Amino acid sequence: MSEHPQGQKHCSFCGKTQSEVGKLIAGEDAYICNECVDVCLDLVQTSQQVEAGDWASKALPKPHEIRAALDQYVIGQDLAKKTLSVAVYNHYKRLKVGQSGHVSKDVEIAKSNILLIGPTGSGKTLLAQTLARLLDVPFAMADATTLTEAGYVGEDVENIVQKLLQKADYDVEKAQKGIIYIDEIDKITRKSENPSITRDVSGEGVQQALLKMIEGTVASIPPQGGRKHPQQEFIQIDTSNILFICGGAFAGLEKIVQQRQEKGGIGFTADVKNKDETKKLAELFRQVEPTDLVKFGLIPEFIGRLPVIATLEELDEEALMQILTEPKNALTRQYQYLFNMENVDLVFEDSALRAVAKRALERNTGARGLRSILENVLLETMYDLPSRTDVGTVFINEAVINGEAEPVYKSERQPKEAVTHESVAKADLKVIDSKSA
């Protein structure tokens, strides 16, 4: 213990005795006085302010730069990318202005959370993940179908913020600038347009619970790995500056939009439309209005918290082909990297990739289905390769994708210049035309 020769207890940091300070706090082998505690607190707070200032001084990517970064990972969806780029830029510009202290007393910029509407596998989750990675902010994802009102079996809405705090390594300041993506938001719609006497704890009840969280409130989060109980101290997280992005497929919403448009008028000025005419899904989604979402089952207050609506298109065959070959994290590139680790080249014929795209379209799973198709096709090959030393190249053609043939094995590896294809030269992928196999 820290004691003077005379036996008086003293602070291990400044050396002052117990009689010279207001309070002396005992540790296992040392003491610290109240004055040194105050100094330490000031140092910690100053350090946090410097870190916050560092973030505020970082150059914020402009909308064009955000869009360019999204283009590297997400194919198509031009309107959604543009909408997201502007919304995210304005959101973090608002945060920087707030931290710099140059806040206008006359104008208060409200938070613009985002609603993504698009079919399954169109890139909603990937867009949100890419944004978080680009901006270097914590990112957490939640499934709305697992959420229930507090007190019922299921996940509490505050668990979403806890996930974000975990991603930020329990750095509160960092977490409060993060992005939360809530998927399957269309699955928590009201079960009926009419009020019900039975409590809807996983539909409208969850929407009500999310309202304050999305708008901005102080959430009480238990410490690391803990569960809530009355005696513990909670970590306070202000959600006012957390960007919430909600996404969903909203199957059936297009019919509501079309019905509204086909009502027309009365008399000679009526807009007569052929009801058999069906518009493209993307075109209908682009014309979504808040009243359509209310009819779908979202409550007006919830829609009001998501003022920015970005719609995504269904992916066609060409888009799926591009997804297989062009992005930085293209699936073909990922599998070729895995095969290269076994000192084997993986070569896809152009017709094979088109067959993969066609099968994904038939399954109606969008880009999400591409991986499962390739995984099934390459399963036996990936099982055998680590045990073989006589394979240098594996060729995949259309017949292999369709289950009509086995992959072709060759002992020698391919010269790099022989396996590049014009359509994917920029991506540096080993994709060859079916005629040159």
UniProtKB/Swiss-Prot annotation:
InterPro entries: AAA+_ATPase, ATP-dep_Clp_protease_ClpX, ATPase_AAA_core, Clp_ATPase_C, Clp_protease_ATP-bd_su_ClpX, ClpX_bact, P-loop_NTPase, Znf_CppX_C4
Residues annotated as binding ATP: 119-126
Protein name listed in UniProt: ATP-dependent Clp protease ATP-binding subunit ClpX
Stated family: Belongs to the ClpX chaperone family.
Keywords: ATP-binding, Chaperone, Metal-binding, Nucleotide-binding, Zinc
Taxonomic classification: Bacteria, Pseudomonadati, Pseudomonadota, Gammaproteobacteria, Moraxellales
GO function terms (MF aspect): ATP binding; ATP hydrolysis activity; ATP-dependent protein folding chaperone; protein dimerization activity; unfolded protein binding; zinc ion binding
Binding site for Zn(2+): 11, 14, 33, 36
Role: ATP-dependent specificity component of the Clp protease. It directs the protease to specific substrates. Can perform chaperone functions in the absence of ClpP.
Subunit structure, as described in the record: Component of the ClpX-ClpP complex. Forms a hexameric ring that, in the presence of ATP, binds to fourteen ClpP subunits assembled into a disk-like structure with a central cavity, resembling the structure of eukaryotic proteasomes.
GO cellular component, one term: HslUV protease complex
Entries under PANTHER family matching the protein: ATP-DEPENDENT CLP PROTEASE ATP-BINDING SUBUNIT CLPX-LIKE, MITOCHONDRIAL, ATP-DEPENDENT CLP PROTEASE ATP-BINDING SUBUNIT CLPX-LIKE, MITOCHONDRIAL-RELATED
Classification via Pfam families: AAA_2, ClpB_D2-small, zf-C4_ClpX
NCBIfam families: clpX, PRK05342.1
Domain ClpX-type ZB: 1-52
The encoding gene: clpX
Record GO biological process: cell division; proteolysis involved in protein catabolic process
